[in-house]
Amino acid sequence: MPELARDFEVVAVDQRGMGLSDKPRDGYDAGTLAGDLVALMDVLGHERFAVVGHDTGYIIGHALAADHPERVDRVALAEIPGPPGVAPSPPLFVPDPINDRVWHIPFNRVDDELTERLVGGREDVFFGYEFAIQGGKKGLPDEVQRYYFDLFSDPDALRGSFGLYRAWGTTLAQNEQRKTTPLKMPVLGIGGAESWGERAGEGMKPAAEDVQSVVIPDTGHWVAEQAPEEMLAALTEFLAPYRENGGGLR
């Protein structure tokens, strides 16, 4: 991110319920989360901008581009196989490598605080397992994992981390409307070769007219942490026309 910020004004956001952002009890559907970002960019004075999202940021980035196309110049989305309900979802019974990447979604959707009761106090077990099975051969550095374990040890942060999944049904209904109008701006799908690979880009083709794909070798789900130089190169090339037109300049 510091390298990308040499050429662009970079706004790094913790989405609602995550990291250092507020953790309300509701408002975790993709439309509301996208609206949060538009409101933030209004405050910062950015009328038009490019969007980069990873994992849940893929879902939010798609919603942001679909709901507010006049604001988004181009969008790069990494490491899921398409927006829920737009791209075909994996079936319930899948081979182990796919199951490793999706099992947490129905688990995280369970309400009545069951997930919090099962995971609370065991954040290192739950999230450590996720980091390991989705990380490919490289995994995540211990200090990065510890940072996330500490964040999720806050009960409100843990609850907030499940919020997007518990609003999945609302987001699915929203995406039924979104997919009726394909995105017109350029879209880049980024996949880790040991994770979703080409499916990160393929999953956006039902939702957009201009989709490019990049697969980053020797990486699992955590492409930015595992291959920062390759990720930077992919983003810099994709964002170059935006910069040349005066967008995002420092």
Where are the regions that the model predicts?
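Short amphipathic alpha-helix adjacent to the substrate-entry channel of hydrolases
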Residues: 1-9
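Flexible "cap/lid" subdomain of the alpha/beta-hydrolase fold that forms the substrate-access gate
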Residues: 11, 18-52, 56-215, 224, ...
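Catalytic histidine-centered segment of alpha/beta-hydrolase-like enzymes
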Residues: 219-232
